[in-house]
Amino acid sequence: MYFKKIIVKMQKKTYKMTSKTEFIGTFCCVDSLNDRKWLKCSYKRIKNTTIYRYHVAINNQQMIQSKQRQQQQQQGIGGMSMLKNILVGQSGGPTAVINSSLYGVIEQGLRNKEKIGTVYGMVHGIEGFLAGNFINLSEVADNEPIDRLKITPASFLGSCRYMLPEDLGDKVYDKLFDTFAQMNIGYVFYIGGNDSMDTVSKLSRVALLKKSDIRFIGVPKTIDNDLVMTDHTPGYGSTAKYVASTLREIILDATCYAHPSVTIVELMGRHAGWVTAASVLARTEYSRNPYLIYMPEHAFDMEEFKKSLKMALEQETAVVVCVSEGIADKDGRFICEYADAASVDGFGHKMLTGCGKYLENYVKAEFGIKCRSIELNLPQRCSSLLASATDIDEAEKAGKAAVVAALDGETGKMITFERDDTNGYEINYGLADVNDICNKEKKFPAEWITAEGTDISDEYIKYVRPLIQGTNIAEYSDGVPVHLKPAYYR
């Protein structure tokens, strides 16, 4: 341990204590490097004041790392060569494990001190970065339990839904690359889904035009599991686990009464039914619910739905139906549009909610029985308490693989998952050209949907089972989960 005489100032509270009392608390410590450090310190009260001079144990490795970074920064200011820095961002819809990928990038970056200087994070994605918002993640890693990212849901850095211009000569690219140069960025990692890979594609192509040696790598993320050229995406396994687990509880609640009823559960999925398909995992040896499962890949017909529901009610008193938000008829009209016109998001995608409510009203009118609709909504994409341990681990490894790829000279690529079932479930991490991935969509395989379009085959169950294995080990304080304080609250 490295012992140093420093000034210790009490944080927030003044405590009444005698001169003999010892207290363990959190304080702001100012050392000779002028770095503010929040540490667990032990001290004795000497006078009636909140400022004390005392000896505090400081981790020697953290001190050395801080000195090294300051020396690198000073060298850069003086015009000498600097180590290239990392810039990482998160974009699109959050997931339960997107921060595990962020942790992987940070951890692998810090591990390569001979090649990488500082790890920076975009606050609110590329949009926030354009506004000058970023954070020094190396400092966060030095002073906080950075591995807590793996149990922190949603996007620690903050997210955005911002599309870079199609015109690669637009001034926004000049601004971005000027800022990259000012920050001595050598590696940019963007964690996200389809539209995020579009950002990686554009930035890597602009770099080529500008003859920039900055390397751009995409790290996959989406609960929709709709990215092409990869077996699956981080975030999907946890969402599948959440959907199956929550559906089991909903089914028990919905079936505990002796009178006929229908419960319609609406799940995320605009054009791909991967999330809704996971509802099949909720079935047990004593209940076939959900009896009916409808996804966007199969045209939805109101009359056929009525017939199928009638048959289900003849076999089961209480029937649970699962539907994707994006189910549509044979003409491509969304069922949610039957009642109201759909609004549009920033990418021009129709914002789909309400098909569950529409079907609820339809069932009440046609069958005259109790019916309620439920939207699992945000928790299905970012609930960390039901996150899959497999998903967390794979997301972290994807982040690490991205750094390794960039240091190997790769750019304009996305990390891919390659399944190997030779000796049980195993994933290898590969690379694919991001231009072959962005703006494309992987549909749920038609052969995994029954001919009537109301059920899922066993092939899917074999595919998804390994992705939901293992349980997240959360940290608790006062009975509720503890997460790492998000960058946008700092």
Tell me what each language-model feature is:
Residues 336-490:
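C-terminal non-catalytic interaction/assembly regions of soluble proteins
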